[in-house]
């Protein structure tokens, strides 16, 4: 997984040159070499990986066209036209007949004029435990997904349901409630590269007081149906299970004066700093 959103934006002369290389390569492809994509695989190829025009219509009928585009696009980093042409042919040779299959975002994005990422997956920092922190985190997720990247987020940084929020004299709705917002944005709003819904993985650690609610909500498909919900299980938890020991569910002490400044979801770092945790139940 990658933590930085890298996008490609070939424009002007560079993009035109990659198109020229692609067309030159396509001329070398005989009709007998064109792989027909029919049935389910044809639909997947057309919907997910073939190049689309400004109206969303596929302009690539065969994998050979896709491979030539990807090869020419990847070769643009070479310093001279001669090297670019040489590496276009080398990349094409590797891709041909599915001998080498790169990530889906490379296949759909390389050699295009669009601002999309070449990375399939991103793990972004946990949201700061505040409304603004959650919204900023959501914006980052949406930005990555709009450029075709999948996103993973650990929500253990958010205080448990019912915990006091002094600034507004209220109580927290908890990470499961916020997870529904992330899920809705992914399922109903985002289209990755205009071809598919966003891909989201939401996580919570095994020590978080809301971990059981996080597990139970998976049974109700009407609530969080736009994300994969996963529990981060530690070696300590597995050892406790093996030895038949109790397991505490806890969270940082919200009364700590440095909570807002220091808490970022890393419980080990919090403890190492000499900070207290509050056990909610065992």
Question: What kind of region is each of these model predictions?
Answer:
Residues 1-282:
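Extended catalytic cores of very large enzyme megasubunits
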């Amino acid at each position: 997984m990658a933590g930085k959103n890298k996008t490609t934006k070939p424009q002007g002369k560079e993009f035109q040159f990659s198109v020229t290389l692609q067309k030159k390569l396509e001329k070398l492809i005989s009709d007998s070499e064109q792989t027909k994509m029919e049935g389910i695989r044809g639909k997947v190829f057309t919907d997910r990986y073939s190049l689309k025009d400004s109206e969303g219509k596929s302009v690539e009928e065969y994998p050979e066209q896709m491979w030539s585009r990807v090869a020419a696009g990847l070769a643009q980093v070479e310093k001279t036209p001669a090297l670019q042409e040489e590496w276009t042919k080398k990349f094409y040779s590797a891709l041909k007949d599915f001998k080498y299959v790169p990530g889906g975002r490379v296949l759909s994005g390389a050699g295009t004029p669009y601002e999309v990422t070449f990375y399939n997956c991103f793990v972004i920092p946990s949201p700061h435990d505040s409304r603004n922190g959650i919204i900023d985190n959501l914006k980052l997720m949406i930005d990555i997904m709009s450029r075709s990247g999948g996103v993973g987020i650990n929500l253990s940084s958010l205080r448990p349901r019912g915990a006091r929020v002094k600034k507004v004299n209220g109580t927290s709705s908890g990470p499961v409630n916020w997870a529904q917002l992330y899920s809705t944005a992914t399922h109903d709003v985002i289209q990755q590269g205009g071809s598919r819904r966003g891909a989201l993985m939401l996580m919570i650690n095994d020590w978080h007081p809301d971990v059981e609610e996080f597990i139970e909500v998976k049974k109700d498909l009407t609530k969080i149906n736009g994300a994969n919900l996963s529990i981060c299980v530690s070696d300590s938890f597995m050892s406790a299970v093996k030895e038949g020991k109790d397991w505490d569910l806890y969270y940082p002490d919200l009364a700590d004066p440095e909570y807002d400044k220091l808490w970022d979801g890393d419980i080990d770092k919090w403890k190492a700093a000499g900070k207290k945790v509050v056990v909610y139940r065992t």
